[in-house]
């Protein structure tokens, strides 16, 4: 296009020809300016002729060491996923309301990530744009997990019951409030770290290193998951560190406290390694932000870029653009105002509004993607919330607020559930290598549908296992103590098998979105943001409704799991009927919900 201009929009690539023209023009006008020569140098982090953040690849060792923080964050997330729903019930919060605490995840993900993304893009710290946020976020995670681990002791000091925790079965209100504060702070901190950590890797990796960088990042996440679930499954920490138990903090609490203190040590080491080896070049505020500075390592979604002639004020792809007119000869006359005419209202509020209003401008096929994605997460989130609780209650017949015998059975089930989640992570990691050939052979539409049908079968399997386990009650407590190895083994197998569809859920929908929106230019990045809405809104629905829904049918986790099975089946059917047939090409993507 002969008179196209580059404009400032969030997450965008500047047109190659425009940047080349800019460099040529500026060199002609100010060839003696050392400052420009420095900024136009191919080695500069922010400016390069090809529009990449880094024009020269960094070493593989640097890439590997620069994203170790992913393992530290994931370690804590694994403990959060496996231990915290059971633990909040030991503080007296009923099962019906235990799901409410998980509201913080989708809310902070929806609100915090746009703020952190924009602030890190504009950060002019001498330590770089991403590392300050990673450091602060990691510190917040450490504070949060310490608050959670010591919530019972803090509540005791603030006036909770002085009765020993082994005999007191009531609600410890102050401890529960402290726990919830720590839980929300933990989710906020997780979202503070994860976005800048991925953006840092995008900053450091060269154009031909994106797939490698993404694989390394996902590998560290898998390592963190495996270590975290292993820590949660041990159940022996309070025996190795008996001084962590107290009058307010019994065995389960001491185990949680020790595991989280280990998480603090591990996260600190990982963060320091990342901070040391990730060499960022400080950002100069008078330079426009590039797409790669903020792009997640999903795909080169903005490869087509935005092309606009001189625009009147208007809307395209759900984003409001202002008229951009300038004379090329005058553009470089005043370097101080070089980019003042490139304007975009990029506040966090504007980002959220754009995400909502852009629903009208998405390709028709994208609406089907959003429906399938929403149903997919309606099927997954009940499992994320209640997996180990289900193992402790339905499979092991335990009760977190019962007598010592039932509490021991419950704790044993929770540890077994954490072991199942460990196997789930292993299967997920192995399955991630199979997704690409499967998509090339069957197509992404069929693969996504297959994953949902697998979830349907597994969640239906939890119902069968629950009914089989409940039939053991008539055999008496001694039989329950010995346990039915068939049902317990089957439950662990279900946990492990769910790693296969989870790997697909973490990758294929984003590649489908990339292909469906491939012809919409800059709308692709916005479509990924809209896809996130199809994740967080179902999470909010499940967080608010799962506990009361279970209570409506007498308690337990079976009602929510049955509903999840129905949602998974519906997602599979709609995926086969409504999703478009896509090309067989597939680029693996990485994703995490936290």
Swiss-Prot record:
Among Gene3D superfamilies, the record links this protein to:
MFS general substrate transporter like domains
Keywords (alphabetical) are:
Acetylation, Cell membrane, Glycoprotein, Membrane, Sugar transport, Symport, Transmembrane, Transmembrane helix, Transport
Instruction: From the UniProt record, list the reaction(s) this protein catalyses.
Output: sucrose(out) + H(+)(out) = sucrose(in) + H(+)(in)
Q: Locations of Low complexity compositional bias?
A: 31-46
How would you summarize where this protein is expressed among tissues?
A: Mostly localized in parenchymatic cells next to vascular tissues (at protein level). Present in stipules, trichomes, hydathodes and guard cells of source leaves, as well as in lateral root tips and flowers.
Q: Which residues carry this modification: N-acetylserine?
A: 2
Residue ranges crossing the lipid bilayer per the database entry:
59-79, 99-119, 132-152, 175-195, 215-235, 258-278, 366-386, 418-438, 446-466, 490-510, 526-546, 556-576
What InterPro entries does this protein's entry cite?
A: MFS (IPR011701), MFS_trans_sf (IPR036259)
- Under which pathway is this protein filed? Glycan biosynthesis; sucrose metabolism
A Gene Ontology CC term for this entry?
plasma membrane
Set out the biological process GO terms recorded for this chain's protein.
response to wounding; sucrose metabolic process; sucrose transport
Pfam families membership:
MFS_1
How is activity regulated here?
Inhibited by protonophores (e.g. dinitrophenol and carbonyl cyanide m-chlorophenyl-hydrazone (CCCP)) and SH group inhibitors (e.g. p-chloromercuribenzene sulphonic acid (PCMBS)).
The record's listing under CDD domains reads: MFS_SLC45_SUC (cd17313)
Per the record, ranges on the Extracellular side are 80-98, 153-174, 236-257, 387-417, 467-489, 547-555
Q: Which residues are glycosylated?
A: 484
**Subcellular location per the Swiss-Prot or TrEMBL entry:** Cell membrane
Which Gene Ontology molecular-function terms are recorded? sucrose transmembrane transporter activity; symporter activity
The protein, known as: Sucrose transport protein SUC3
